[in-house]
Amino acid sequence: MYALTGHITIKKGICILFCCICLGTTAYGQVEQFQEHAQTLCEDATFSSALVGIKAVTGEGEVMVSVNEAKMLAPASNMKLISTGTALFSLGPEYRFCTTLAHDGYISDGVLHGNLYIVGGGDPLLGSKDTVATALNEVFEQWEKDVRRAGIRSIEGAVVGDGRWLEGRGVEPTWQWGDLGTYYGAGVSGLMFYENMMSFTVSPGPEVGAPVKMEPYYPGCSWMDFRFCGVTGEKGTGDQLYMYASEFEPVAEIRGTFGLDRGTKRVDCSNMFPEYTCAVYFKNHLERKGIRCINGAGDFKLKKDWMKEGTADSVKVIGSHYSPVLERIAFKTNHESNNLLAETLFRALGKENTGSSCIDSSYVALKGVLKKMHVGSSGLSLQDGSGLSRQNLVSADFMCRFLGAMMDSSCFEEYLWSLPVPGGNGTLQYNMKGVPDDVRTRFRIKSGSMNGVRCYSGYILPAGFTLERGAEIPQEIKDRTIIFSVMTNNCVSSTWKVRQILDRFMVELGK
């Protein structure tokens, strides 16, 4: 009996050993195949001038592909994976930004003898048209109720936009000058408004060389000195208009060309004075509702006449407004690749962890969070939170380490949901066209692109697993998930060709 049992055990052991050898051989063969795919990609003529870094690992840590994984490359918007991830990890998915309404001075017979302050707390979606944000008229109506509840029927001072939540400049010094006037180059401020944009309607002139017709649309910034220098370009030249402005003077010049065959369209540019814009719009709202503001609107940067009447050192809070939760902000950040939101999360890390939202403090805070995540900062040299700076440098190895640490965190489900699916809504809508849904929908990735740069990093979920909102992801699924990063720099080939080749590589990796 015992001999027979031992004989069966030996047979079982031999079978198990044989299976393990087969599985090991298969796994090795797959890794070898993936490595060949990666080498083929690097040797493609499309990337003849490019630097390429690739790494892919399983959730258990097994390396599947590794090519130049330690080379540090410009990540472009792949930086948003880091800013949204560290914010979710450090601040929590339920974190909200708070804007408060306050006044100084005193109230007598319905008159506020002082100033009314809109004290910004870094809410990047105040006044945004996005459906995730509270509609501006609702915010203003609530603030109006707060003003009336405080017994204020008239304001002898000014309505002041207070953006001092932000220390230092709102833009990163290494951003390119040509980006600063664009909607995607809008800098952070303590009090933001309409995502720090201003919109114009643009239409071509009657002939090539004629002035472009351009008018402010929203918000109406009447205090700005706009210099419209754009001209009508040849057919097929598209929109090549750029706005050049700075936060030091309310002057903006729009230069470039707008194609003769283009129809009337809306163009979004950056607003360097969102604090004052918000104050003006709320002041106008109050006056429409019968609450006079004797000294108009002001801020701490553009219009400071009001400071003769008050110092804002001691104020009484009479109302507040909260942003959407961070989880939803992260979703919008990664799906739209929204630079302003990413920069805000980066600065919030500094504010909450060091007490300062300046760039240097935010960098120190982010490195501290990475240390808590046991990721470290080797393979990372950052300048901002959005990836707009070309001086950001990240290795594929660091990106995989970071994504692996996020998988082990308590906020992984929220983080994963924030990442777009190829072919779906967001910045990946043109990726993986024609790829079957059961393959395509397993990907949760973030793209990064600028001139000469194309990067993709994220997760490939196991086949047969359906991701459900709010459901915990089993460890077995995490172990079988592929974590990857593909980064290309200095590539002069066409965008569509690069995207097509990288799509094929990612699909092969997913198989």
Mark where each language-model region is:
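Small-residue-rich helix-loop
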Residues: 64-66, 336, 343-511
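Residue-level preference for non-acidic, small/hydrophobic
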Residues: 61, 80-87, 159, 191, ...
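Beta-lactamase-like hydrolase cores
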Residues: 30-60, 65-71, 145-151
